[in-house]
Amino acid sequence: MAEKGEGFYPRQVPIDAYGNGGFRFGGMSHRGSLLCFPDGIWAWPVTSIAELTIAALEPAFARADQLDFFLIGGGRDPFVLPDRLRKRFRDVSLSVDAMPTGAAVRTWNVLLAERRRVGAALIAVP
């Protein structure tokens, strides 16, 4: 995960658009994937579901007590979260749902509007 000031947006905001390898939010454009939390939106180097590891998702596990729900947008297609990752989310008592990035962005925006304690890992769609 990038350090503050390096691929960091300092608050939780809706995602306005996604595609072409990035996202638009907060009046700016970002190329690449994102980790979104109540304390901000971070650049995230993951580019495919093959790169989803416990280490890649560690920022979510570290913030589990600050979240009620975590979304994983895995790109264009639906996918099943591997058992080892589901188990890790269970171990930290954090509900998780895996879906295509578009669905995750829409769900993020709805949960944010409801003022829910939500986090998301969003893999950029080409």
Give short role names for the model-derived ranges.
Residues 1-55, 113-126:
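Non-catalytic interface/targeting segments
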Residues 43-45, 78-81, 107:
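Short active-site-adjacent helix-start/loop capping segments
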Residues 53-61, 107-108:
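Short, charged beta->alpha transition segments
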Residues 60-98:
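Mid-chain, well-packed structural core segment of small domains
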Residues 101-106:
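Short acidic loop-to-helix transition motifs that present clustered carboxylates
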